[in-house]
């Protein structure tokens, strides 16, 4: 009797193929999979840190304003308490930065860009506590700073921390988790996941190494950080300006003019920031005592303004819906714009731990609203709404200053939930970016990073000369 050998060979061959496939999977390099898993861990931690930072800033601001209520009957005492509360909080932030982690000063975004190029160190064990608590002091004191700078730098440092703790090896893992943390930090700061992704791809395009693994990791990190944010803050737009009307096609040329205005102002604003940095450095001369006292004076000034003219202090998120609704006169808009330009320059250029995204969004809103009010008066036949120009202006200053128009556009759309205004926003942002580029202005973060690297090189050269001199003696 013959045996049916082919029927027995087929299952055996299938089992051999399965075993070979399993062996190949086990022998394959696990680094890409590990990076993606760690990206989820980084995104989760960054989201939780951003929520804690946001809640902490809000709590400090509420406590500070609550302390003023007890002195409401005594106006001189009220002003004194307003100044001192903000000054003390600001001095705390300045002291932490100067004493323990100077790289935690300012926005922190240029530091992440430098780290992605392996030109700046990432000392997460110092930067994380200093940036977190120092930022609580300066932002809680009412200084004109944004929360996105701290969350981006905290996010990048969390990425490096996770890398070190789990001992992942290789340049790809180090670079990818650093970028993932930064993107997750921006997404959690503004509840804007797509803007967080575009921020890495567009703003950090010279430093970001685009690979399938790196971009997937950024996506995963941003998703997890946004989920963490929405668990604690609900799924609502960060800035509630209501649903604005669409912009008719025959009015789009006005948005191009608005973009040209921002294209002129953006490079000028960048020069003012760098010039103010030089001026304030001459004031304190690198002395920690003078620097902390100077920071306390700036913080105290913001505290006074927060009581006397609230629209001129703070990050600006409370100002944006009020300005967009048209609740300010033209004269008041001009005053707010000038005052916020001055306070933004003082706060950001002094090296306080805090970002500049939010203050620039507020400045763009105020200038856009003022332009819209003029357009409404000059062209009544168009039935214009000044608020649409305010929304277009929000992202235009970002586009002109840091040269990231896509990030600015998507960020504003996600924050305000007015997607019908995407066309006028593109026109405004494109006009602002092109003119700023043609005038030769350098992107703000690139200019700050170049200064930091030049200072670092000078310090290294001075140390090497001192070491050589000591050896010769």
From Swiss-Prot:
Any one Gene Ontology cellular component term annotated for this protein: plasma membrane
Subunit structure: Homodimer.
Record has NADP as a keyword: no
Swiss-Prot/TrEMBL catalytic activity: 2 chloride(in) + H(+)(out) = 2 chloride(out) + H(+)(in)
Site (Mediates proton transfer from the protein to the inner aqueous phase): residue numbering on this chain: 203
Presence of keyword Repressor: no
Family annotation (PANTHER family): CHLORIDE CHANNEL PROTEIN
Compartments it resides in: Cell inner membrane
Single Gene Ontology MF annotation: antiporter activity
Annotated binding of chloride, by residue: 107, 356-357, 445
Organism: Escherichia fergusonii (strain ATCC 35469 / DSM 13698 / CCUG 18766 / IAM 14443 / JCM 21226 / LMG 7866 / NBRC 102419 / NCTC 12128 / CDC 0568-73)
Protein name, UniProt field: H(+)/Cl(-) exchange transporter ClcA
Topological type in the membrane: Multi-pass membrane protein
Residue ranges that the UniProt entry lists as topological domain Periplasmic: 70-76, 233-252, 310-329, 377-386
């Amino acid at each position: 009797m013959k045996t049916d050998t082919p029927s027995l060979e087929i299952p055996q061959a299938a089992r051999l193929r399965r075993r070979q496939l399993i062996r190949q999977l086990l022998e394959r390099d696990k680094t890409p999979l590990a990076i993606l898993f760690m990206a989820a861990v980084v995104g989760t931690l960054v989201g939780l840190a951003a929520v804690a930072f946001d809640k902490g800033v809000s709590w400090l601001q509420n406590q500070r304003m609550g302390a003023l209520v007890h002195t409401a009957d005594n106006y001189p005492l009220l002003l004194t308490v307003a100044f001192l509360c903000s000054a003390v909080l600001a001095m705390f932030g300045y002291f932490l930065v100067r004493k323990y982690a100077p790289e935690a000063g300012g926005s922190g975004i240029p530091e992440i860009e430098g780290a992605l190029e392996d030109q700046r160190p990432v000392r997460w064990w110092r930067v994380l506590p200093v940036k977190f608590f120092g930022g609580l002091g300066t932002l809680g004191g009412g200084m004109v700073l944004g929360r996105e700078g701290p969350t981006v730098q905290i996010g990048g440092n969390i990425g490096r921390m996770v890398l070190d703790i789990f001992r992942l090896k290789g340049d790809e893992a180090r670079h990818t988790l650093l970028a993932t943390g930064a993107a997750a930090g921006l997404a959690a700061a503004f509840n804007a996941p797509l803007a967080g992704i575009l921020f890495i791809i567009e703003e950090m395009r010279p430093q970001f190494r685009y690979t399938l693994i790196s971009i997937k990791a950024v996506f995963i990190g941003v998703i997890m950080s946004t989920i963490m944010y929405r668990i604690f803050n609900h799924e609502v737009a960060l800035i509630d300006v209501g649903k604005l009307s669409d912009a008719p096609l025959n009015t789009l040329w006005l948005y191009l003019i608005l973009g040209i205005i921002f294209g002129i102002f953006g490079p000028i604003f960048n020069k003012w920031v760098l010039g103010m940095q030089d001026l304030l450095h001459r004031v304190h001369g690198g002395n920690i005592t003078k620097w902390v006292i100077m920071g306390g004076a700036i913080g105290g000034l913001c505290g006074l303004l927060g009581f006397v003219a609230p629209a001129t202090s703070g990050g600006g998120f409370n100002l944006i819906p009020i300005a967009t609704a048209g609740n300010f006169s033209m004269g008041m808009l001009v005053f707010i714009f000038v005052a916020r330009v001055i306070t933004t320059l003082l706060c950001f250029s002094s090296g306080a731990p805090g970002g500049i995204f939010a203050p620039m969004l507020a400045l763009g809103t105020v200038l856009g609203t003022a332009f819209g009010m003029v357009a409404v008066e000059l062209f009544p036949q168009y039935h214009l709404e000044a608020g649409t120009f305010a929304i277009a202006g929000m992202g235009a200053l970002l586009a002109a200053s840091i040269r990231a128009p896509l990030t600015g556009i998507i960020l504003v759309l996600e924050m305000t939930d007015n997607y019908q205004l995407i066309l006028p926003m593109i026109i405004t942002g494109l006009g602002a970016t092109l003119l700023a580029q043609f005038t030769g202005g350098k992107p703000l973060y690139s200019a700050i990073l170049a200064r930091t690297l030049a200072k670092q090189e000078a310090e290294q050269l001075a140390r090497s000369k001192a070491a050589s001199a000591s050896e010769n003696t």
